[in-house]
């Protein structure tokens, strides 16, 4: 059973998947930082200093106007559309980057498929047999 698991775990697909998950998690953290630390502050500056992470709609009378989103969530039910907007921007960036990576990979793959493959060299014994066949065929016709 241990040997079977070892074969499974060391197969190329499993290792490739593990590497992909690790790189994906790291990439997600980078995109998250890009959105929260770069893009959203720029959008906030353009819109007059708005902090989208604190935008919400209170669904409870216990939530007072102007409370930070984290406190409002603790006090009562709220719809955090500012947080949703931030996550939607995250998703859009990740989806676009993945699209570009897959597009580039497909382009490389199609270039590789388009290259003419060199014909295999015919072995000497096969050439000799073909010559003998041709000579015998010519002798029969004569």
From Swiss-Prot:
It holds the Pfam family MscL. It is a multi-pass membrane protein. GO terms for cellular component: plasma membrane. The chain crosses the membrane at residues 14-34, 38-58, 82-102. Its main location: membrane. It comes from the Bacteria. Signal peptide: none annotated. It is found in: Cell inner membrane. SUPFAM superfamilies: Gated mechanosensitive channel. Keywords: Cell inner membrane, Cell membrane, Ion channel, Ion transport, Membrane, Transmembrane, Transmembrane helix, Transport. The keyword GTP-binding does not apply. One of its GO terms (molecular function) is mechanosensitive monoatomic ion channel activity. Gene3D superfamilies: Large-conductance mechanosensitive channel, MscL, domain 1 (1.10.1200.120). Channel that opens in response to stretch forces in the membrane lipid bilayer. May participate in the regulation of osmotic pressure changes within the cell. Belongs to the MscL family. Homopentamer. This is Large-conductance mechanosensitive channel. The gene is mscL.
